[in-house]
């Protein structure tokens, strides 16, 4: 079996694509995979390091405002389409799978026009424009959030699968994780992070939160500031007269490399609302306070957060409205109402899809030529 996988620009498109690629390798003993991306996206660096063959095409995204640059983009789209046709002719795939990002457009379209089975996966509650267009041509559309289905015209080819999570998320053990971070068994653990680079607004709100909950008998806090914000955050604590030596329940790190262990140790989470993060929170049944990144394309993080908040799995605080006082109140509401915390955890777990990868692979099998 031969498969082309395409998706790029950001890690949110690339890592699900790589998860699907590995899922195909597990399911089909003789699968050959080619990853098609652009040289400008993160995939040009990430994919070869993941040991998958990589080919690039020329394509870039349209500007949202009227711009002469869009004439160049349209020319590149045509050129990228011709390059995609050439790659497809040479590689001769049995299936083409797209996970979003503008690079998907030419590749999935070229495959669909040649009658090659195609599948796309949408990570967010509000689908990206590329996937909204491609859904009209793809044989299968797999989605992470039920909320996203309304934005697609053809509902007959849509399957709610969820988003594949890292295998280590499901394999990690809580007691081992607690010991690793020197956390106590008899306290609730609040995990706070703002993505790999951190989030300045969350860090600012956490200064007051640490002041409030330092030495609290019910709660311990594990907070990742992000590498870029660590020094500034530690200085903020100092300027506010906060000395961590006096608190036995606060752990501050610039970055958490073994995030799967941190998540397993947590009882509640404060974070941004990227699709991959929410997939991991729900598969573990974690209640959360979500502060969506306000500059995400098409505001998709707010849509993601709302999908959880409306089902009782999370509290949504907009970035523009976040203050230390608001965060403290949200944490207080969860701490003081154990029944609410328990119900949020149940609601979160209901949304979790630990079989997401397996379900996506089944959708791939459904559209493969019979001889496969």
From Swiss-Prot:
GO terms for molecular function: UDP-N-acetyl-D-glucosamine:N-acetylmuramoyl-L-alanyl-D-glutamyl-meso-2,6-diaminopimelyl-D-alanyl-D-alanine-diphosphoundecaprenol 4-beta-N-acetylglucosaminlytransferase activity; undecaprenyldiphospho-muramoylpentapeptide beta-N-acetylglucosaminyltransferase activity. GO terms for biological process: carbohydrate metabolic process; cell division; cell wall organization; lipid glycosylation; peptidoglycan biosynthetic process; regulation of cell shape. Gene3D superfamilies: Glycogen Phosphorylase B (3.40.50.2000). Its main location: membrane. InterPro entries: GlcNAc_MurG, Glyco_trans_28_C, GlycoTrans_28_N. It catalyses: di-trans,octa-cis-undecaprenyl diphospho-N-acetyl-alpha-D-muramoyl-L-alanyl-D-glutamyl-meso-2,6-diaminopimeloyl-D-alanyl-D-alanine + UDP-N-acetyl-alpha-D-glucosamine = di-trans,octa-cis-undecaprenyl diphospho-[N-acetyl-alpha-D-glucosaminyl-(1->4)]-N-acetyl-alpha-D-muramoyl-L-alanyl-D-glutamyl-meso-2,6-diaminopimeloyl-D-alanyl-D-alanine + UDP + H(+). One of its GO terms (cellular component) is plasma membrane. It comes from the Bacteria. Pathway: Cell wall biogenesis; peptidoglycan biosynthesis. It is an enzyme of class 2 (transferase). It is a peripheral membrane protein. It is found in: Cell membrane. Transmembrane segments: none annotated. Its EC number is 2.4.1.227. Coiled coil: none annotated. UDP-N-acetyl-alpha-D-glucosamine binds at residues 10-12, 124, 166, 196, 256, 301. Keywords: Cell cycle, Cell division, Cell membrane, Cell shape, Cell wall biogenesis/degradation, Glycosyltransferase, Membrane, Peptidoglycan synthesis, Transferase. HAMAP family: MurG. Cell wall formation. Catalyzes the transfer of a GlcNAc subunit on undecaprenyl-pyrophosphoryl-MurNAc-pentapeptide (lipid intermediate I) to form undecaprenyl-pyrophosphoryl-MurNAc-(pentapeptide)GlcNAc (lipid intermediate II). This is UDP-N-acetylglucosamine--N-acetylmuramyl-(pentapeptide) pyrophosphoryl-undecaprenol N-acetylglucosamine transferase. It comes from Desulforamulus reducens (strain ATCC BAA-1160 / DSM 100696 / MI-1) (Desulfotomaculum reducens).
